[in-house]
Curated annotation (Swiss-Prot):
Region (Disordered), start-end ranges: 1-27
Protein family according to the UniProt entry: Belongs to the universal ribosomal protein uS8 family.
Superkingdom of this protein's organism: Bacteria
Gene Ontology annotations for the cellular component aspect, listed alphabetically: ribonucleoprotein complex; ribosome
Function description: One of the primary rRNA binding proteins, it binds directly to 16S rRNA central domain where it helps coordinate assembly of the platform of the 30S subunit.
Pfam families per record: Ribosomal_S8
Quaternary data: Part of the 30S ribosomal subunit. Contacts proteins S5 and S12.
A Gene Ontology molecular function term of the record: rRNA binding
Keyword line: Ribonucleoprotein, Ribosomal protein, RNA-binding, rRNA-binding
The name this protein goes by in its record: Small ribosomal subunit protein uS8
GO biological process, one term: translation
Native source species: Thioalkalivibrio sulfidiphilus (strain HL-EbGR7)
Originating gene: rpsH
Amino acid sequence: MSMTDPVADMLTRIRNGQRASKNEVSMPASKLKESIAKVLKDEGYIADYGVDAADGKPVLNIKLKYFQGKPVIETIKRVSRPGLRIYRSKDELPKVIGGLGVAIVSTSNGVMTDRAARALGQGGEVLCIVA
């Protein structure tokens, strides 16, 4: 059976992995998931990520990050979904917790944070919010 929303599956695996205090979570890889993982790493929400080929299929491994035994990611939510896409202009991009969190946005220049998209003067699809 095919997956309806692979990004939501990725976010759920990260959320569940941190609740279970796992060091690492694995999932089927894609370019979009890899881009999201890169943004999470650049923003300091995950320790590292990598793509391995298991049985000829790419697998994305994400090393989760904890601070004093608590997960670094407090909230990770999907915003735009297959049934209801959410697009925002540069002026309408959400500020998560007054700028303390990030919104991950898919733009024509790739996947980036809301701050980077605002700096480039671009809007796009709001994939998720992380705090």
